């Protein structure tokens, strides 16, 4: 039967198995005579066909190629069986179950599942096998024979399939490609396991809880946490005496070995250990995908798709294994007696389990060494970094602590004491954690050498595996053997090339089932899944902070070690990450690779570009909770929040009371009043002090009442002018200079005549209430002119002279002119200079409810006057010439009213008395009207009534108004003074074709007045009335006067713009 099995397994079993079967068919059958010997290796065969088939193993010849796929075979029978895999033909059916097979040998192997026959028994350890290929492979574990060497490296293997898989390392061949993401693998089993990432299949379910797993090894390791029966491969022989004492329990042997390291060694010398058993290498076979899992391990019930996979699977002693005579002696050996190596089987602890999974992150490994290397990434090696809160145990790894704490959870749930050693899988001897002689901590290089044995000779960097060192050496040599065919970019490993090629294909094969995001790479996909689950399996051994991947943990460790391995070659500055170094090098190179698509600005970082792009849009994700302003950056918001609190007031540290009670420093800013009337000039760029009227809604008082005012800064932004609160109070403005005290005197060339002078209006600025100027009419009437006083020592004084337009009655009004003379010394006379609007530093906004209407009052007499400049020279009482100059002012500040001079003129002494009376006010105000902020000329009558006139500049006259004769210098523009409502304009039809004029209403004289000698008599009180031109006194009643405009040219255009 063994010959048939060997012959039928010539292609599927390893070549050495067939050869060995012909050479040594098994202990139950005698070996046939060997007639044909191989000249290469000396092996002998009974048939020439076997020798020919064997020689193709040395030459690598595979003459039989499949027409449907690239596979080739050494024998025709292997090709025949392989083609049945394409056609689906399975002519051999099991009589006990519905399964069918493509070759008779597979059926015979399958029949052993039903019969349970184990015909091949090992003479050294007594293990029994169902198949000869497993038996031959097992014999090589005892002999250490590896007859299949690699021609490219010194490695050797126990069967040809393992050698073929190893050859892929040198050739880079990955024949099994995923149809979804294009990732390729060297073995079909790896491809099937990978495809579960896309399908979400988790076929291995725990019978004790609803958890599912993608690998059976993960399930087996998980079942140990439930306290189930010991999994295959766990300790079955009697442990050493030290381990039989009650102690800590671990899930797998790797945790125990790592836990034993901090313990001090026992005082007596340890007995010599038995010879180390030969542990088979674990590899996954490249089986055909159409074959079902017909090969099942009797120890762990794990199924395999081919005999080679089952052969490579670690043999597990099953419950149906026959008792071995050498299994256990009648009496357990003593502690000082070494166990007999031959009669006993190899120590089971040395045989790894089918798979080892990392508890924190779920990764699985085929060997204990692989799991041990991986677990160093979860915690600090050496030292007791993790301590159990339920007992005094401490562990160097987080995984060990998690496995240990599961024991306490099970004990609490069952209400029983901790499990004893005989019920445990792996037992730790209970020794004191702190030995009598404290063990000094290992040097910093010791853990690295223990955990990372492969060290680079160039830079001293260490690695866990030889492949990591090999890839690292390519950084020093610059070797990039894997080149992209699309763009020519080269990489040091094939996996990096496969990842890079997705940039050209755009394939995003990994899709999140919760949010629908797709990813190109599995690592990004796994990291994204942890964002949903909140899982952070990688914990820092120093501070306990956890991370989602190992790279973040490695970068974080630089914080504790202070390591900055990446140094700049230009300035020597070092960095913890290569990305920071690349960004820093742009400072030296001037590279700014990130360009804004909306403007020519460039940036060195993509984050700066994203922040800049918010300035082009209305996006302001960071909003102030106090005033509602938005900002593009959180730093800008934090800086803005400081403006709401006074700089010298510390933030409140008391707990806020229940309810909407803001902190004390921000009480005034958090609770604005119910209504605010704030009007800001749109062109002003200055510090504004806004007085805000309080409403009904008031903030709760938490301290001294804050002033109901706030200083703002008006700033021009892309969205327009914005008010920004300023915590810096503006300096107190200096007090205004004392206004000059002026009086209008008739010139020395005054004509003869009697009569009393009429008292005209007075001009008053906003700064001086109750101050005034006396206007004396001359022979030519009243006019407006700017002149400089000849008697004044100072220069640049701006004066106002009134002159009549038309001739009037003989008397003081017909004097040639009047002169504005200061009452104080000339240095004290100040000139009012109006600055441009952008130089105004403080603006006091008036309430919007100010009166803006014009009330026209009737008068008894009408005198027509027109405002115009006067050219030429004027004479004064001293006889000196007064040179006229272009006026720079519209308003003249005057002194107090009590210092006004009154009395008869030089030629009027004794003719009558002049009465002081109440003079009229003239001032400018900035008022809020329906049309916005406007400058208004306010005329106050003798009886306290006010008339407001608006001032504006125009290029052309409106209909119905005629331009006066140009008497001033060239370049004059038009200034319109109109009533504040300005709802109607006077046209020629309303006035009979005349021109709009300004009239003075002069009442009859009230009697003589006394005054200083040498001064003319003061005129009587007058009122200003706006009437249409051409209308005589008494022709039109004052109540029916419409709103009109007065046109006057002024040479100083910039003065108009200040209002």
UniProtKB/Swiss-Prot annotation:
It is found in: Nucleus. Residues 226-247, 260-280, 312-351, 644-674 are annotated as: Disordered. GO terms for biological process: regulation of DNA-templated transcription; spermatogenesis. One of its GO terms (cellular component) is nucleus. Residues 818-864 are annotated as: 4 X approximate tandem repeats. Residues 263-279, 336-351 have a biased composition (Pro residues). The modification Phosphothreonine is found at residues 199, 589. It comes from the Eukaryota. A zinc finger (C2H2-type) spans 36-58, 64-86, 92-114, 120-142, 148-170, 176-198, 204-226, 356-378, 386-408, 454-476, 482-504, 510-532, 538-560, 566-588, 594-616, 622-644. Interacts with TAF4B. This is Zinc finger protein 628. It comes from Homo sapiens (Human).
